[in-house]
Amino acid sequence: MNPEVIITNMKKRYSGVSGTINALLPVQAKTLSIGFVGTDLPGAQLAQTNHPERFSYLSVWQAIWISRKRLPNGQPRIWHVRRDPEMMLTIFLRDVLRFPIKIVFTSAAKHRHSWFPRWLISKMDGVISTTPEAASFVPNTTRVVPHGISLERFSPPEDKLTIWRRTGLPGKYGIGTFGRVRPDKGMDIFVEAMIQLLPEFPDYTAVIAGLCTPQFAGFQKQLEQKIAAAGLSERIVFLGVIDADTVADWYQNVLITVACPRYEPFGLTPLEGMACGCAVVASDTGAFRTIVDEGKTGYVVPTDSGEELAKAIRQLMDATLAIAMGKQGRERVAAQFTVDTEAGGIAAVYASVWQD
């Protein structure tokens, strides 16, 4: 195996970056020879199963060893990296050890990087920004390529009205938020809105799906105490970590997906919810204003406002309206935000880097 592109995922915990790599690998392996380095992902396993002739797992040392030489056609091998340590490694290989490689980096941050990441990014051969705003902070952006998701993996259930029954939780309908349990993800804002709304809407139960690290155990405990004081412990439920293979089931289960972080570089949760037929309420950060078609697929509200979040969610607690918006959301994702479209944009960047 002599991969054209080496894709890295050198972080142990599953994150938003991991999620984008996970979605892309099976699609990219259809047309590219890929070597995958780092923490395993379901998408990597699928890519190897479906395209064993074009996909291989590599250790870091194996990837370094094969990168000493050019590809058989004389082209340099591309390393596609997404994190600072990965940029540092590849710059060392290319500029110090003089390996014949090219480096592509994906940037999603919607703020000016500090001096060291700026320097690292300036050394890239190609830079992909996920939004025009992210590109405005990276002068050497090669192309803007929005993230996309798999319509096969994220799909609506046969009956959104009755699917909640399979959860065994109270009520007829679900409202879900997906992400790590910590302040920057706005989980306290979500809980505030649910405490305000759920007593008025007995048919609804809220779920919070995501990892809580020991650092934020106290934060979750405070939220649980607030929920208990409101008498809602059975109707605002912490699910904990949801396996990447089954997270789509929970998007199917809920009628409304809420994404209310205080800051997000891009944010996949509204896309994943919309693809599963959910109406969406999102805070005004990340790419959410681009993703959500206001009033048609959901609503975007000011960041850090539980009151505004509750107002928007209240409008969607009409199941008929929420289902209609969810259908439009699925159509919007299919038209603009598929992983196939993202993979095509990335392939175009690879091609331009090889031509330089």
Regions found by a protein language model. Give the residues of each.
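Donor nucleotide-sugar binding/catalytic pocket of nucleotide-sugar-dependent glycosyltransferases
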Residues: 121-160, 169-170
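Short hydrophobic beta-strand element within catalytic cores of glycosyltransferases
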Residues: 279-283
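Nucleotide-activated donor-binding/catalytic signature segment of Leloir-type glycosyltransferases, i.e.
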Residues: 220-241
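Conserved acidic donor-binding segment of nucleotide-sugar-dependent glycosyltransferases
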Residues: 294-295, 299-306, 314-320
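Conserved donor-binding/catalytic core segment of Leloir-type glycosyltransferases
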Residues: 166-185, 191-195, 207
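A short, well-ordered alpha-helix in the C-terminal region of glycosyltransferases
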Residues: 321-336, 342-345
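Aromatic "clamp/platform" in nucleotide-sugar-dependent glycosyltransferases that forms part
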Residues: 262
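Short alpha-helical donor nucleotide-sugar binding micro-motif in glycosyltransferases
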Residues: 241-242, 249-254
